[in-house]
Amino acid sequence: MLKADPECGIAYWGIALSLLLNPHVPTPAKNLAEGAAAIAKGKSVGAKTQRERDYIDALAIIYVDHDKVGHLPRTQGYAKAMEQVAQRYPNDDEAQIHYALSLNASASAADKTYANQLKGAAILEPIFARQPQHPGVAHYLIHLYDYPPIAEKGLNAARIYAKIAPDAAHAQHMPSHIFTRVGYWQESIDSNKVAQRVAKEASDLHDQLHAMDYQVYAYLQLGQDGKAKTLLDEMPSVTGFTETFLVGPYALAVSPARYAIERGDWKAAASLEVRPSPLSQVQAITYFARALGAARSGNPEAAKVDIAKLVELRDKLQGKDAYWSEQVDIQQKVTSAWVLHAEGKYDDALSAMSAAADAEDKTEKHPVTPGVPTPARELYGVMLLDRGKPTEALVAFEATLKKEPNRLRAYVGAAKAAEKSGDAAKAKEYYGKVVAIAANADTTRTDVADARAHLSR
C-alpha cells in the first residue's frame, strides 16, 4: 500500500494495529515503539477522509505514554475512543467490529456480569448473521464468549471459524478456547493438532507453542499422559521466538507444571527447573509448582524458599500489571496454605486455602492459557477431603466443575467426597463421569481404575 501511496495515512494505521499483535496481551516494548512511530506518521501525512482520521486518532490512544502507562488503562482508553467512532459511523461494520473487540480486551477480570463481553457479542451477532464468512467476527465472538457462564454461546462461531481460514494457525486454534471452556477435550486436541501443524509450516512459533500448551492440558484431562509427555518433550525444540511476548514463554513454563500437578507427581513438581524469562508472571508459574510440590511432598521449608520468590515477583508486577500481580498473589496464598497444612496447622491451612479460592473465583483466567496451573477451589476440596470433611469438599469440587466442566481431577475428588459423605447416588454419577471422560486413559492413572472398580461393585 505504502509503495503505491507513501502518503496513505490509513496504511500507517494498519501497521500500528498489526504491531499490537494480540490486544489481550501486553505488546512487546519494541512493537510499541514502532507502532507509536507508525501512528505518528499516519497523523502527520494526513488521511483522505474524516472517517480515516477518526480511526487513526482512536488507535493513537493505545500508544500514548506506552512506556509509562500499563496495557489495560491504555486499552480502556482505546475502547472509549472506538465507542465514539462506532457511534459516529453506525453503518460501518468494521467500526462496530473493532469496538466490540476493544470491549473484550478492556474488560475487568473482576466483572462477573460480563457486561463488556455481552455488549460486544450483541454488536457482533447481527453482523455474523449477515456475514457468516467474516473471519474477524467469528474470531472475536469466540474471545467474547470465552468465559464459563457464557461459553456455550460461542460454539457456533467456534465450529465455523476454522472452516473460514484453514491456512491460518490462529484460526485453527481459536475454537479450542470454547471447547476448553465446555470441556470438549478431544475437540480441543483435534483443533490444536491442526493449529500446531499450520503454525510450524509458517514458522509461527508463538502459535505453535500455544497450540501445544492447549493440547497438553486436554490430554491430561483425558488421562492420556503419554501423549501429553510427547508434546512436552517436543516443546523446548521450538526456539527463536520473542521472549517478551507472553504466549510462547507462558506455554513453555506452564506445560511442565501442569504435567506434574495434574498427575499428582509432587516430587517432580518440586524439582522443576525455572526457565529464564524477562516476564515475572512466567517465572512465577514454575515457582508456584515447585512450592506446591514441596509442600505436598512434606518439605515446607523448601516450599518457603519458592514462596519468597513468588512474593518478589508479585511485588515486581505491582504497579505495572495489576492482573498478573493478583494472579501471582493468589499463587502465593495457595502455596502458603499448603505449607501450613504440611506443618500440621490444619485449621489455619483450611482458612488460608478458602481465602485463596475465594480470591481466585473473583478473577478470570487469561486468554493466553486454557486454565490456571491448577484451580484453587479444587485444591481447597482436596484439603477438605484430607481433613475428613467430605461434605464440604464435595461443594468445593462441584463449584470447580461448574466453572471448569469435565476437569478430571475435580470429578475424581467429587466422586471420593460423595462416597465418603454417604451420597451413593452422586458417587456413582461422578465415578461414571471419571470413567467416561478417561475411557482411553493410560493405565498409570490409578484414579480411573479405582472409579471402574467402584462402578463394578
Regions found by a protein language model. Give the residues of each.
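Solenoid-like repeat scaffolds
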Residues: 1-4, 86-88, 128-130, 159-167, ...
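Inter-helical turn/loop elements of alpha-helical hairpins
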Residues: 4-5, 15-49, 57-73, 106-115, ...
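Amphipathic alpha-helical repeat scaffolds of TPR domains
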Residues: 7-19, 47-68, 91-109, 131-145, ...
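TPR/TPR-like (Sel1-like) alpha-helical repeat modules
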Residues: 16, 20, 30-47, 190-197, ...
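Residue at a conserved register position within TPR or TPR-like alpha-solenoid repeats
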Residues: 19, 61, 103, 144-145, ...
